[in-house]
Amino acid sequence: MVEAAAGRRSGANRRRPSGGGERRRQQQQHQRLVAVAVAARVVMVAPAATPAPAAGGGGGCVEDILGCLLGVLRALGVTWAAAARPQRQQPRLAAQTPRGPAPGADGRRAAAELRGIPGRIAGNGACAVASLYTLQGKKGVNQDAMIVWENFCSREDTIFCGVFDGHGPNGHLVAKRVRDLLPIKLGADLGTDEGRQTSTSSIKSNGDETGSPGNMGRDAEQNGEYPEIFTALRTSFLRAFNVMDRDLKLHKSIDCFFSGTTAVAVLKQGRNLIIGNLGDSRAILGTRDKDNQLMAVQLTVDLKPNIPSEAQRIRQRRGRIFALPEEPEVARVWLPKYNSPGLAMARAFGDFCLKDYGLISMPEVSYHRITEKDEFVVLATDGVWDVLSNTEVVSIVNRATSRASAARLLVESAHRAWRARFPTSKIDDCAVVCLFLDTDELSETSSSMARDMTNAVEVSSGQHSNTIQLSTGVSSDVVTAVLTDGDDLSAVDAVAKLVTLTDLPNNASGATQSITTK
C-alpha cells in the first residue's frame, strides 16, 4: 500500500517540469521517505481511533488510512512544488507552525525595555533634580507626554527632559512615540564623532540667521561667537529632529497625515543648557535679578503662524493662514484649496498634509549658560501657558513645599485657572516638567545619591538607578532610522537660510502672554 502510494506520488512528480536529473532523483527519494513515515504514523494511530471492520467487510479501516494518506500526499505535493527553491533546507512540515512574535509583541517589548531603563521617567513622578506631572483635560484622551532622563548618554552631568503636545486623531500616539524615540536618536547622534563635528563651520557662518533670541544672543555678543559645545550640540539636535520626523513618516501603524505633536527638549550638560523647540509649547527659566527677586526669562518662542518670518515661509509654499471667526486671535495654517486642517502652529512633528506647504520640523535651537542666580527651568504644554503667565508659573513653582510636588502644584493651578477664566470652555491637557538647577553643593549630593542608587541596582534589578548605558540599555530594535554616514544637513540648512528670527518678538522679559487656544 505504502509503495503504491509512493509510486503514484513519484509518477505525478515526473509529469511536472523540473531541472537536473540528479537533483530530481534526490527529491523523489526524499518524498518517498516522508510518505512512508507519514503512513507508518497513520497506521500506528488508526487502530486506537477506528473500530475494527466487520468480518468480510473488506477494509473500512484500510479505506480510512488510504484516504488520510492520499490527503497527506496531496498536501505534501503542493508544499514541495511551492518550496522547491534553492533556499529550502528543511521540509515544509516543520514550518507550518508560526514561530514569529505575535502582532504588537515587538512594540510591547520595546516599551518594556524603555520603562526598565534606570534614570528614565516618562510618567507622573519625581527624582532628585526634577518633577513631572500631567493631567488629562476635558477634550478626550490625554495627548500630552513628557520625559526626564537622568545620566543621559551615561554622563553623570547630563539630563534630558522634554514635553510633547499631540494633536489630531492620533496625536497621543505621535506624542508618545516622539517622547520615546527622540532622546534615543539624540543620544545615538551624540555618541558619534560625526554628530559632534558635522556642519559646525556652517552653523557658525549661519549663526546670525538661525540663532534664537534670549541669552544665546547675549552670549554671542560677549564672546564674539557661540560656545563650541553649542555648535556641536545644535547639529545633533537638528539631525535628531530630522530623523524623528522621517521615522513618523515611514511608520506603518501610526497615521501622521493629519496628526502631529509639538516638542520642547532641554539637554543640561554641566552648566550648559541646549533648548530645542517645535510648536507652541514653552520653556522658561526661573532666575534672580540684581535685587535678588525671582523673575521669569522665556527660553523659547511660541512658533505660531502669526510670526512674520513663519508666515512668510508658509505663504511662499502656498499654505494659507487665517483665523476662524469664533477665534479671531488664533492664526491657523490651512491647505491651499481646502479649509483643513487649521493647525495653530508653524512647526511640528508629523502633520504631513502640510509639510509641502510651509510646515517644517526643524527646531529652533538656543543656548543658555547656567549661572549661580538660575534656580529652575519649567517646560510645559500650552494648556498651562493659555491660562498662566510666565511670572505666575515661576511664582507657583517657587512656593511649592518640595521639588517633588512642584510640577503637580503647577498643573493643578492651571486647571483651577481654566475653570475660573473659561468656565464654558473645555480644559486642555496639561503637562509640566520642572528641572532644578543645582548649586555645587546640591550637585555633589546628587552625585552621591546616584552612586548609592547604582550600588542598590546591582543588588536588585527591580530598583531604579541614575546610571544608564545607552548603547546597551536599549535594544537595536528600538533605535530605528538612526542617521548613517551618508546623511547630511544640506536640506535642513537650506531651509534655515529662509527662516530668520530677526522679526521674532523677544519675550524674554517674563511678561504675561496673550491667551490663545488651539
Curated annotation (Swiss-Prot):
Polar residues composition bias: residue spans: 197-213
Binding residues for Mn(2+) 1: D165, G166
Region (Disordered): 1-31, 86-108, 192-222
Catalytic activity line of the entry: O-phospho-L-seryl-[protein] + H2O = L-seryl-[protein] + phosphate; O-phospho-L-threonyl-[protein] + H2O = L-threonyl-[protein] + phosphate
Residue stretches making up the PPM-type phosphatase domain: 129-437
Class in the EC hierarchy, top level: hydrolase
Family annotation (Gene3D superfamilies): PPM-type phosphatase domain (3.60.40.10)
The protein's required cofactors: Mg(2+); Mn(2+)
InterPro entries named in the record: PP2C (IPR015655), PPM-type-like_dom_sf (IPR036457), PPM-type_phosphatase-like_dom (IPR001932)
Oxidoreductase found in the keyword field: no
EC number(s) given by UniProt: 3.1.3.16
Protein family according to the UniProt entry: Belongs to the PP2C family.
Name of the protein described by the UniProt record: Probable protein phosphatase 2C 14
